[in-house]
């Protein structure tokens, strides 16, 4: 390493782009403020924020400064998920789908839910979690008459891994994606954004994913259905 800096701001000087990795705080979004204000293309590791409102604020800054900005799960870009998206028309209309993974609801559930978004697109409006603190079973309702069941179990409950199931009017499909080189595909998508301006994952969509996860978490705490608008407006 030729240059060692003392602050994140110094690290973002005289560079072509900024990569912000997950520091375990769930608040790495705060390191994006400086490069975004300087107009430096920025990638922020998932989850952009634990709270949807914080994610929305940094997303608004990216739009206001017109700076290329990306935050996304690497599972959006693995070949198996890309191929599933291509095969979607063969399955007919999808009104029911499931996604599952092990570990924490937000930190790892974002990968499972991102597979759903990569294949079926956005549109979540509410979540109802009928699971337990260590075994989440969240029904996420979408505005296009689609329901997605997101199952995320802590390590004591299930092993790590990812799976997506689509139940269409013409056929069903189950995919357990191959995760080989998954970070390579993610970085390729970011470089494409830097070079061409092509947004593979609009920041508004990533904010919605975080809002759906937060709504799922709050639903379990409150014992009721929680809308995405509720978490986005929370103080």
Where is each model-derived feature located?
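A contiguous active-site-proximal alpha/beta segment in oxidoreductase catalytic domains
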Residues: 43, 48-107
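C-terminal substrate-binding/catalytic lobe of Rossmann-fold NAD(P)-dependent oxidoreductases
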Residues: 134-190
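C-terminal helix-rich "cap/oligomerization" subdomain common to oxidoreductases
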Residues: 10, 14-22, 193-235
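A general structural signal for well-ordered alpha-helical segments in protein cores
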Residues: 28, 55, 81, 112-113, ...
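Generic hydrophobic alpha-helical segments
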Residues: 32, 84, 189-190, 216
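Beta-loop-alpha module in the N-terminal Rossmann-like domain of NAD(P)-dependent dehydrogenases
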Residues: 2-60
